[in-house]
Amino acid sequence: MPPPSLLHLHSRAPLQPRPFRMNSRAAPSRVVVCSVASAEGFISAAPILLPDGPWKQVEGGVTAAKGFKAAGIYGGLRAKGEKPDLALVTCDVDATVAGTFTTNVVAAAPVLYCKHALSTSKTGRAVLINAGQANAATGDLGYQDAVDSADAVAKLLNVSTDNILIQSTGVIGQRIKKEALLNSLPRLVGSLSSSVQGANSAAVAITTTDLVSKSIAVQTEIGGVAIRIGGMAKGSGMIHPNMATMLGVLTTDAQVSNDVWREMVRTSVSRSFNQITVDGDTSTNDCVIAMASGLSGLSRIQSLDSIEAQQFQACLDAVMQGLAKSIAWDGEGATCLIEVTVSGANNEAEAAKIARSVASSSLVKAAVFGRDPNWGRIACSVGYSGIQFDANRLDISLGVIPLMKNGQPLPFDRSAASRYLKDAGDAHGTVNIDISVGSGGGNGKAWGCDLSYKYVEINAEYTT
């Protein structure tokens, strides 16, 4: 098990993708009234980037697991009504819940609220998410907005307020449009559905500058019982390891003890969302909430050492990695996903740190965008990762093209390497960078994207 990451964790007890259409990040000029049924038409779904394993994709996202419903509607929180901006995910029973949160000291009001709620109750029933205002750096009034929102949802669902968790995304320094939110909640609750459409509408509603929504669900068999894990996430910019402007909600019908669930979620986050980077900025709002309903019929998983726990952990890792890769793939202005794989390190944590260093390098990202196979930038970013290794054991490959072996540069076809980068960019595909630093058993991955002119344009005009 890897050592704890820097994020904070609090605990309480095949999908067929829609055809992908690249959209402009400019918001449509029309204003609409959006229902759950029409919500998914406002933005395309991300490609499915699920790792291979003993599981299969199923329909439903966060509603695939037994006991969960979701909805996404337009509630008037966005500056323009181009797509939904309020989402709700609920569980029919008291769910065991774990949450991971930003390491940014300027934590948003919903983050502070969730930490408090998770410290006072061992169960959860719902997650409310708004897009448009981050409700970060908003002081006591912003915190009260989060409390009032949770209280209103709790009354509509007839559950305790501390069983409601809150996530927000949008412009930092802006409080939520509470009147619009509160007025929309009855319609949001009335729209809840266990259907695929319910899950898809919620996944759309939480997006901001995202070009695509991110939703996934899988089914696997553990102990002879079919269990499902579903999830949705948002993120495109302000993405960097140790959580970023990314929100995630995970659902499962497995039954897991409180302590085991907390550790499993922490481990999966460290192998997925903490291993992605777009721009090096760590947000005030990042938050992943994971709920386990226990309705699958599988006996409670009570030990991390059990075969059942190990099988479930692998599946949870895969779902979170699939969502994390979709976020990096959808990086603001990106033309391709970058996947960095490191082997031969002393342990998993060291391999992960090296991979993050390479994926985070602005020079590596710019070289990929320029279709320049400048392997020296890769070697440099491995070297400043903070991990000690024998430089004479360093191997680097770009796709199937070896660039360095045992610390020595290799002759290679620069035109072929450049063409590999160009083809990946033209197809919005994946650039694979493989690195070996020795003969140790530590392996790790990280994901990023190239750095384009468009990224600067998007963020220069974000609030104007």
Swiss-Prot record:
Pathway named in the protein's UniProt entry: Amino-acid biosynthesis; L-arginine biosynthesis; L-ornithine and N-acetyl-L-glutamate from L-glutamate and N(2)-acetyl-L-ornithine (cyclic): step 1/1; Amino-acid biosynthesis; L-arginine biosynthesis; N(2)-acetyl-L-ornithine from L-glutamate: step 1/4
Annotated site, Cleavage, chain positions: 244-245
Gene Ontology CC terms: chloroplast
Substrates-to-products reaction catalysed: N(2)-acetyl-L-ornithine + L-glutamate = N-acetyl-L-glutamate + L-ornithine; L-glutamate + acetyl-CoA = N-acetyl-L-glutamate + CoA + H(+)
Location, primary (coarse class): plastid
Record's keyword terms, sorted: Acyltransferase, Amino-acid biosynthesis, Arginine biosynthesis, Autocatalytic cleavage, Chloroplast, Multifunctional enzyme, Plastid, Transferase
UniProt site (Involved in the stabilization of negative charge on the oxyanion by the formation of the oxyanion hole): 169-170
Biological processes annotated in GO: L-arginine biosynthetic process; ornithine biosynthetic process
Binding site residues for substrate: 208, 234, 245, 332, 459, 464
Subcellular locations according to the entry: Plastid, Chloroplast
UniProt-listed CDD domains: OAT
Keyword Phosphoprotein: no
E.C. code: 2.3.1.35, 2.3.1.1
Cited Gene3D superfamilies: ArgJ beta chain, C-terminal domain, L-amino peptidase D-ALA esterase/amidase
Family to which this protein belongs: Belongs to the ArgJ family.
Subunit field text: Heterodimer of an alpha and a beta chain.
HAMAP family in alphabetical order: ArgJ
Function: Catalyzes two activities which are involved in the cyclic version of arginine biosynthesis: the synthesis of acetylglutamate from glutamate and acetyl-CoA, and of ornithine by transacetylation between acetylornithine and glutamate.
More about this protein: This protein may be expected to contain an N-terminal transit peptide but none has been predicted.
Name listed for the protein in its UniProt record: Arginine biosynthesis bifunctional protein ArgJ, chloroplastic
